[in-house]
């Protein structure tokens, strides 16, 4: 059987992708030159894998490229782009998973995979298969961000998002449980655990961290007053990890921080890569997970 715990060389993995406390003292503080050297090495490794994948290699050959043409990260602009429409065509061409994964039935039988999907805003949600290293790295990236923001062993993080085909709640759970020593309180959405009960659980178990969407955080703060006759600030929350994309003028963050009495940190990610960018305690912009992603 393809046992998950045997699917990764864990000592190798930790050398490649440092755990949160080590990351905060190494990659997170490295100078740009050292980051660039590491990224170039990893980029070439990924490109070599891409040449073994029909979806990528066909596109690259159509663009007139050969394997020897890509020699460093400086050559990334020579690689043709693809978009969600190309992924949809891949799914239609080779259902149900598409050929962009480079996965066949023998891989599926020998390796544990996790399926997550997009939100489906432009059509049927697109599925992405994550093999163990990709799945772990998504969770680890979230854990690193939380550690930099102040999460520590013994904290309790409430996750009022349902573990479904969306990856955010799964990764928050794994980040806490597998990499931080933080207790994940997986209450799910209000459909699973009513808002009043969410708050009752929070007070009972000492929730001091949250991962949630801003709109529901406002709902929780209001319900705490109207249904429990309490102030949500009584929870003494250390910080909240949220997703503030629509908050262009900062008004929503300001309201949330006032009502909760704690910092609200923005997060950027996708269902394909997990946490790509995060805010630190200074809240002056995004840090990138630079040993995992590259921003052009």
Question: Over which residues does each language-model region extend?
Answer:
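Conserved ATP-dependent adenylate/AMP-binding module captured primarily in the ANL superfamily
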Residues: 74, 138-156, 193-206
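Short glycine-enriched loops at secondary-structure junctions
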Residues: 112, 135, 162-166, 215
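Conserved S/T- and glycine-rich ATP-binding loop of Class I adenylate-forming
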Residues: 50, 117-121, 157, 210, ...
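Active-site glycine/GP-rich loop and adjacent strand/helix microenvironment
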Residues: 1-34, 41, 45-48, 181-296
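Acidic/glycine-enriched edge-of-secondary-structure segments
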Residues: 123-137, 175, 182-186, 206-215
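Active-site phosphate/pyrophosphate- and oxyanion-stabilizing loops and adjacent acidic/basic residues
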Residues: 116, 174, 254
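Nucleotide 5′-phosphate-binding alpha/beta core
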Residues: 1-117, 124-137, 148, 204, ...
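Conserved AMP-binding loop of ANL adenylate-forming enzymes
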Residues: 143-179
């Amino acid at each position: 059987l393809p046992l998950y715990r045997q699917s990764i060389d864990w000592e190798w993995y930790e050398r490649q992708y440092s755990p949160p406390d080590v990351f905060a003292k190494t990659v997170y503080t490295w100078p740009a030159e050292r980051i660039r050297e590491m990224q170039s090495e990893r980029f070439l490794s990924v490109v070599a894998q891409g040449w073994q994948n029909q979806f990528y290699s066909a596109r690259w050959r159509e663009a007139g490229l050969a394997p020897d043409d890509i020699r460093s990260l400086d050559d990334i602009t020579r690689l043709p782009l693809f978009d969600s429409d190309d992924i949809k065509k891949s799914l239609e061409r080779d259902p149900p998973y598409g050929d962009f994964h480079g996965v066949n039935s023998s891989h599926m039988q020998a390796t544990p995979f996790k399926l997550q999907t997009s939100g489906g805003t432009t059509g049927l949600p697109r599925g992405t298969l994550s093999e163990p290293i990709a799945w772990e790295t998504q969770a680890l990236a979230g854990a690193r961000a939380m550690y930099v923001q102040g999460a520590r062993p013994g904290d309790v993080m409430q996750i009022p998002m349902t573990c479904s085909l969306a990856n955010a709640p799964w990764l928050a759970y794994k980040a806490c449980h597998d990499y931080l020593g933080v207790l994940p309180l997986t209450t799910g959405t209000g459909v699973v655990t009513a808002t009043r009960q969410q708050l009752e659980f929070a007070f009972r178990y000492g929730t001091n961290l949250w991962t949630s969407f801003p709109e529901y955080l406002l709902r929780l703060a209001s319900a705490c007053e109207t249904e429990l006759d309490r102030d949500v600030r009584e929870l003494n929350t250390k910080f909240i990890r949220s997703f503030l994309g629509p908050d262009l003028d900062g008004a929503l963050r300001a309201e949330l921080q006032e009502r909760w009495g704690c910092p609200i940190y923005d997060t950027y990610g996708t269902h394909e890569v997990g946490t790509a960018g995060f805010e630190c305690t200074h809240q002056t912009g995004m840090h990138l997970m630079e040993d995992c992603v590259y921003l052009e």
